[in-house]
Structure formats: C-alpha cells, structure tokens
Amino acid sequence: MAPKKKLELDIRGMTCDRCPQHIERALKQVAGVETVEIPGWRSNKATLIVKSDIAERDLTASVEGAGYHATVKSSSAIDGEIEQSAQSSFTEDGGHDFDLLVIGAGSAGFAAAIKATDLGFRVGMIGYGAIGGTCVNVGCVPSKTLIRAAEAWHNAGHHPFKGANTQQGNLDWDLVRTQKDDLVSQMRQSKYVNVLAAYPKITYIEGAAQFTKDGSVRVGERIYTADRYVIATGAHPRMIDFPGSEKAEALNSTTLMELEQLPKSLIVLGGRAVALELGQTMARLGVDVLILQRSTRLVPDHEPEIGRGIKDYLEQEGIGVITGVEVKRLSRDGDTRIVHARVLGQEREFKADQILMALGREANTKGMGLEHMDVKLEQNGAIVVDKYMQSSNPTIYATGDVTNNPEFVYVAAAGGSVAAQNALADTKKPLDLSTVPGVIFTDPQIATVGLTEAQAKNEGYRVKTSTVGLEHVARAQAARDTRGFIKLVADETTNRLLGAHILAAEGGEAIQTATLAIKYGIKVDDLADTLFPYLTQVEGLKLAAIAFEKDIAMLSCCAA
C-alpha cells in the first residue's frame, strides 16, 4: 500500500459558493490526489489526502492556474486507508470530529451551528433537555402568550369605551395553560426540530456536555473533539437560599407558569422585568399580588420616571408594591408562606399562598469542566468573553445568557452567529452592543434603547431632554389610554439622539425607530422633519423630537 499524507492548504481568493468547486477540480487534475475537502469559500482552506511522493508545488501551481492563491499550511503522514466524511473528520492521524462543536441547543446555539454550516464547516451541536432553550420553552414564548391572555380577560371587564359593554365571564386556567403549552410545542417543532432537519450537516448529540482534562468533550460514554467550541448553555432562574427557603418552596418563573391551580395570593420578590410581567399577569388573572423590591424603586436601571410611573399604574390595578425591602428569611405555616423582612428599619411579615422569586438568572456553567480549559468566569458563573465572543481560551467562544451580555434572545442569536464566524473564518467581527433595544411587557410597556439621562451625563455629554406625555399622542387619545410618556435624551452639541425611553401601551412597537436613529447618528431635528403616519404610537417619537424646540400642546394635528 503506497504511503499517503494529509495536506492542509491555505486558499485565498475565494468569493462565492462556486469557487470551491473550481479549486477542487483543479486539485484533482494533479496526479496523486485522492480526496479534496473544502468546507466552504469563507473557510479559506482545503484538506487533501495525497500520495506521499506528490510534489506540493504542483498542487499550489494548479490552484494558481485556476485563478486563486494557495500555500501549504501543514503536512502529516498517514498510515492505512482513511475515509474522509463530511460528517466527521475524526481520523487515525489525530483529526477532530468537528470543525465546530456547539454546546447548547437554544437560539444562540442554533445561530452558531447554522452560521458554521453556511460557511461550509462540519458542525456538531449538543443539546441537553428540551430542544430550543429558554426562550421557546420556559421564557419569552409561554410568558408573553400568558400576558396576552391575562390582558384580554382583564380588558373585558375594564375597557374605557362607553356603550361597548363586555363581561369577563369565568376564567378557565386549565384551558389557558393548555393553549400556552400547545403554542410552545408548535414553535419548538417549527423553529427548532424542523429547522434542525433542514440542516443535515449539523450532527445533533443529546446529553450533558463536560470538558475533560485532555480538552475533549464527554457526553455520556462518548468523547468528541473539535477545532473550536461555542458554549451556549444559557442560564436558569436564580434562587437565593434565604433561611427557611427549603420549607417555603418558593416558585421561579418556570414553575409558576406550570402551576395546575392558580394561588389566591402571591408575593413576588424582585422588581425588574420578570417580576413585573408575571406579577401583573397573575393579578389580572385574579390573584392577589404583592411585589417586594430590594431597591428603592422598580426597574432601577431605567429612567426614574419610568420606575415611578409603572409603580403607579400597577397600584391602580390593585397590585401592592413595596420598595426598599430587605428579606431576612422565609417560613411556612401550613399552606401559608411568610416573608420576614426589614422595611425602613422596621421588621415586617408578609403572607401569601405562594412566593415567586424573580431575582435574576445564573449562567449554566457548573459541572461543565471549564476549569480544565482555563476558561475565566465572572463571580456569578458567567463566561467572560470579549467583543468577538472569545473566552480566555482562544479555542472556546461563548454567547447568550451563559455570558454577561444583555439577556435578550436576539442578542444571544446575534452573538452565536458572530462567535461561529470568528471561530472558524479567521475574522475579528465584533458583536455591536452599542444600541440594544429592550422591552418589558407590562401594561403599559417599558421600551428603552441607548443612554439614560444620567448615563449620558456620566459619559461627558452636554445633555438635553424632552418628554411628551401620552395625552399629546393622538393614537393614545383615540385608544383612550394615555398612560405614560416618551422621553428622548440628546447631545446638545451635535443634536444627535442618545437614548429613547418609552412607557406606553404597545411602546415596544415604537422603539425600533429610535434604535435605528441612534445607531446611524440621526439628529433629533431629522426625526422632527421625518413624516410619521398619523394615529400611530410611533408618532410620539416625532412629537418628542419636536418638543426639544416647541410646545407641542400649541400645535395642530401633524403640524411641525
């Protein structure tokens, strides 16, 4: 049997999907070439199995003749017959199973795997638990459909239109929960199971992944290796171990939405997105809700006006809100849960049927063996990554909630794509987090992007602001819901928009306009001069831009 060797060529000049075909044909015309594998035109590489006596200059010359440039990157001897496979490159000469192994099968993991496949690389993806990750299974999808169900039932008994008489009727929680579960199943199937089937070059592996001391990944009894790794294992609800927590058996966001029977009363620990969304949802479904927040205001990372405003609106619906609460311990007396706390220097007790802990999330990194890979972690267990999504180990990238990047599914997915490209294509593409819009799906909604007034001042800008109450927005007047406001933050020197902060019904539908304005450096007078359709909520952005210079109360409809 003639001796063989494996060559890896660095190819330059490929610009489209047809280029690898041209190069493969050119290389196979050289005597002694047995197999050619080019992952994709963006990979800039070709792997060959050739006879050992082949002249390497003949290979590079053949590539040059096809209009490209090639250099030999590595050469290694092979003993015996090697069968190359598009699904696995684990070979007797010490090759790897995959070019990229993605750990995690949620939105971030899928984005990384799809990008790597699009680039032409061999991809493995390890999933543990329900495919689809947090968003579709226990996060965005189930919570938002419950929010809409609760809103519909609430509005049936509380809408502001005279003469349009409606009644709430009875609430069938079993049916509400079943419809929620059906939607989760449908979206998991259509957006993950079916999508995976459409990418046959992604090898799906089920099980918990753990790095070993030799740098490989163990899943059950199997060992896998890869050139590069992307960790996208997400996060889970943070459950603080207060004294008495074991007996109190507090709920988290997942277990709350799975309850077979709604409690009569609920204490919510927390005052940010999940706490407010689920707290209001439960209240609108007939549960007596009390929100206890450690900070002195709700949503403390937002503009103070938003925290004050949403507190007032929640209280108007009968939801109790107490801020400045220091929880000391939990206890239980039969079916009653008790929160023992200090409020303004006084010891107090709060009682309810159930307690919901909505106190943030913790990264899923425990038990992964990352200590074997010298991967640096934050104190909360999150993987430290740079703007290219690369960890302290140059072969390992991470994205999504397992990092300390903003916990939004769209940030996770964007990071997955960036991580895969940088890991495999020798690029340095940063994940742009300069303009990340966020929406809290309370009613009214909280929608923000860019800098708050305080943040802008801290960064050294000469700041100017404008605020328009929803009573000046025609859409809100027609809908008879003028709760809230729109606040814009701008640089007085350049007139560029720096931040937008909305508290309004369906405010999330208006925030993307502000996002684009900030991203592309649009000035507030450009916003003011732009045509906005009348009787839309987003027209409020135009009015807020005009309000920097004029009193909009003195303008007619659509006037500028």
Regions found by a protein language model. Give the residues of each.
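A Rossmann-like FAD-binding core segment of flavoenzymes
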Residues: T166-Q167, I202-E206, Q210-R218, L285-K387, ...
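Glycine-rich dinucleotide-binding loop and its adjacent helix/turn
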Residues: A86, C140, T233-D288, L292, ...
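Glycine-rich flavin
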Residues: S88, G95-F98, I114-F121, I126-L262, ...
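Beta1/beta-strand and adjacent pyrophosphate-binding region of the FAD-binding site
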Residues: T91-A108, L262-R272
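FAD-site-proximal beta/loop scaffold in flavoenzymes
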Residues: E246-P263, E349-A425, E509, T513, ...
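Flexible, glycine-rich terminal cap/loop adjacent to redox cofactors
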Residues: I103-A108, A112, T117-G129, V141, ...
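Short hydrophobic core segments
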Residues: L101-I103, A209, Y224-G234, V268-L269, ...
